[in-house]
Amino acid sequence: MGNFACVDEDSAHAVSILAPYAFHVHAKDWLVHEFEEDFPSGYKTRGCRRLVGCSVGEGNMPIKRCLAILKSAGYDGYVSIEYEGPNDCIEGIRLGIENLKSFGVTTE
């Protein structure tokens, strides 16, 4: 869900276009820093935004909205987590799982 931000696209809009074709999704979140050239870390998008990875549900990506779009399109598959944050990866994933559960995603 968050990868669309890497090319300055609206994640919810992109998910709405692709949802009917989805057979697997992964959730990823970013803290977006608008047009900060001197930002010391993260990724620089083609539009000069800086993206810093964070736990799913802790950033600026519309994760809940994307999940709702997927559900309304009939997606009932797995949601994997992709964590690229600066903190411990186990803790980052644990927090992402908690947040996804609070958004209505079930675990097995």
Annotated model-derived regions:
Residues 1-60:
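Acidic/histidine-rich catalytic cores of soluble enzymes
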Residues 6, 64, 107:
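Active-site acidic/histidine proton-transfer and metal-coordination neighborhood
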Residues 14, 18, 65-66, 95-100:
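A general structural detector for well-ordered alpha-helical segments in enzyme core domains, enriched
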Residues 21-23, 73-77:
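Short, well-ordered coil/turn segments that N-cap beta-strands
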Residues 58-72:
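A short, acidic, amphipathic alpha-helical segment used as a generic capping/interface helix at domain edges
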Residues 80-89:
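A short, acidic, flexible beta-alpha connecting loop/helix-capping segment that sits on the rim
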Residues 89-108:
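C-terminal helical cap(s) of enzyme catalytic domains, especially alpha/beta-barrels
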